[in-house]
Amino acid sequence: MVTNITLILTLMTLASVTAQTFQYSRGWTNGKRDGHKRDELRDEVLERILTPCQLDKLKYVLEGKPLNDRLFVPCDYIEEEVNQPKRYKGERNHELFDVFQ
């Protein structure tokens, strides 16, 4: 009987020591993994490596959306299109102007 109790206490002690060692060796604190700083650092590194246009393209592909021509166009061309001012195109509105003149 005494050996059974001793064996149970020894196993419980060994299990609690092993669990505590695992908890502190893996960087766990209060049940949460200490990875928040690493996530922020990873995001900063990605922002330095990839432009917003490239991130949008990567997100588009990872979401499983169908490939289109816009994915294969270099980001420089897309950014130039966005930065250019919108031009007035009067060809479509000739009939409207004729009515008011």
UniProtKB/Swiss-Prot annotation:
This is Pro-corazonin. Belongs to the corazonin family. The keyword Ribonucleoprotein does not apply. Residues 1-19 form the signal peptide. Disulfide bonds: none annotated. The modification Pyrrolidone carboxylic acid is found at Q20. One of its GO terms (cellular component) is extracellular region. The keyword Metal-binding does not apply. The modification Asparagine amide is found at N30. Pfam families: Corazonin. InterPro entries: Procorazonin. Keywords: Amidation, Cleavage on pair of basic residues, Neuropeptide, Pyrrolidone carboxylic acid, Secreted, Signal. Cardioactive peptide. Corazonin is probably involved in the physiological regulation of the heart beat. One of its GO terms (molecular function) is neuropeptide hormone activity. GO terms for biological process: neuropeptide signaling pathway; positive regulation of heart contraction. It comes from Bombyx mori.
